[in-house]
Amino acid sequence: MPALICGSLAFDTITNFPGRFAQQILPEQVHILNVSFLVPTLRREWGGCAGNIAYTLKQLGGEPVILAALGNDGGEYLARLQSLGLDTSQVLVEPAEHTAQCMIITDADNNQITAFHPGAMSVAHHARVPTPAQRADLAIGIIAPDGREAMRDHAHQMHAAGIPFIFDPGQQLPQFDGAEHREIVGMARWVAVNDYEARMLCERVGCDLPTLSRTPGLEGLVVTLAAEGCDVWQRGEVVRVPGVVAREVLDPTGCGDAFRAGLLYGLERGWTLVRSAALGNRLGALKISSRGGQNHRLEPSIVGN
């Protein structure tokens, strides 16, 4: 059955600087910083958490429905999503804004300078979660990083519609205070964060992971640990789900989104959270072997038994 993917759609512009930032930036002159970097390589990727999650979930055989916002330059992205067979009926096109864009410069030491323009993501809350009367087939959902208002509103709307969802605050976690996090976690069925985000979330809500995992109505809390796998917390108990060795490590962009697609695929089918997380680990290891968040290809065998 369909899964509602609430999150961002963005263009990622990725460049590489063959030198070192440290050799170009003088610490004693940072108050008058004015630098320019020659970047011989440039690539533009389809990105955004909603797009990345939907891309992988569709390859798994899922039925993602994207709820997100594109700007006046998003026509090509919308057409691509549709060419992949993705349901874009809930995508908002905002003519007064550009599509969200992330611009990254990476130096020879893998240090990064990133600029992010939210664009249409800032008005993503204008798109609304369908009510049961409008669409009764939505079996599961996810609140992935998006505009702050969109994440808050869509969580409330999914909860009101009776759609069980994963709360995946990601890089937007600092945008919410402790009371807001407690409110959204209280509406969610599952929470997914990385280890750094887990520490920050616990600090914000004022409790540890065992206590947070006992939140009434919460069926599980997943903490990803990169190559080490992930921890699955349920009612105060934790299970370590081992990581999967990647064939090659090329680009971590979108690995977390691929993992979350695995969670959605398994949970929608009634799998245990541990089994769903194991699929997520396999997908993350596969994704890291390709560049960009939407260029990897899946073999049917990755789903397993």
Model-derived features: positions:
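Gly/Ala-rich phosphate-binding loop of Rossmann-like dinucleotide-binding domains
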Residues: K58, H159, E268
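Ribokinase/PfkB-type carbohydrate-kinase core domain
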Residues: M1-R20, L42, E63-V65, A79-E97, ...
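A broad detector of short, well-ordered amphipathic alpha-helices
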Residues: N52-Y55, G186, Y196, V274-A278, ...
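Short, conserved aromatic-histidine micro-motifs
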Residues: V30-F37, G75-E76, G141, A278-R291
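Glycine-rich phosphate/adenosyl-contacting loop at the front of the ribokinase-like
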Residues: M1-V65, E76, V249
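Conserved phosphate-binding/catalytic region of the ribokinase-like
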Residues: G206-N305
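Alpha-helical transmembrane segments within multi-pass membrane transporters and channels
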Residues: A69-G71
